[in-house]
Amino acid sequence: NPDVAAQSLRLDGEELNLARVMVNGGGTSFKIDGNQLVLENLPEGNDAFDLEIFTTCDPSKNTQLSGLYVSNESFFTQCEAEGFRRITYFLDRPDVMASYTVTLRADAQKYPVLLSNGNLLEQGKLEDGRHFAKWIDPHKKPCYLFALVAGQLVAREQRIVSRSGKEHLLQVFVRPGDLDKTEHAMNSLMASVAWDEARFGLPLDLERFMIVATSDFNMGAMENKGLNIFNTKFVLANPATATDYDFASIESVV
């Protein structure tokens, strides 16, 4: 609010290792107050400035399954309601809307699939057997809708065409060996997308829509922007053993 006197910037953070803070490429004063990073003496006026915060965290020790965590040697996020503050210092409130550009780098054999919200802008190989993927979400969103996934996953894919003639890619990612259990989830996703467009005139606003299934997920389903993360019970259905209730549950959640 330009009519309010300048105040300290307080950013939420939990269980983070802070390396450094920079403003417009230079050092700046800060302090830690409980679970907040407090920045003072920021540039005055209404001019924008660049704030860079370098942090690390340990997802392998994150037993809360909130923020960035490891499940079966893969990385997942759960940011609702206040999990993003466990990834980096941020204004972790639902009224703060921002666009995100995310670059993921990892060992290509251990983590061949690198996902985040939005559209895949670029991907490629790096040195020492590593690779990268760069994602950009052009739509502003609260940080609790941020998502990240990295691991050994395979995908069922389906291309669809909206009423405007634009092509979109639908993907359902699962563990290797579970791909044959994803047909109903994909059919449910296609039906959901078609219904949104027919009923409300709302086509997909991204180039792709992704669902990822994991067994260690404490929310059942999390509808992150463009990258939904679901518990496997709401994605996987073996036609030989699943009940009508299982199929109905998948359709209702997807």
Residue map of PLM features:
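Aromatic/His-enriched, Gly/Pro-containing loop or helix-boundary segments
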Residues: S8, M22-G45, Q78-I87, T232-V253
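A surface-exposed beta-strand-loop module
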Residues: A6, G13-S71, D128
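Generic beta-strand hydrophobic packing signal
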Residues: L9, E14, A19-V21, V102, ...
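Short coil/turn motif common to extracellular beta-sandwich-like domains
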Residues: P2-S8
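The feature marks proteins involved in alpha-glucan
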Residues: V70-E80
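Short, hydrophobic/aromatic-enriched beta-strand segments in well-ordered soluble domains
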Residues: N1, G13, D47-N62, Y100-A108, ...
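Hydrophobic helix-coil surface modules that form long, contiguous segments used
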Residues: C79-E82, F90-S252
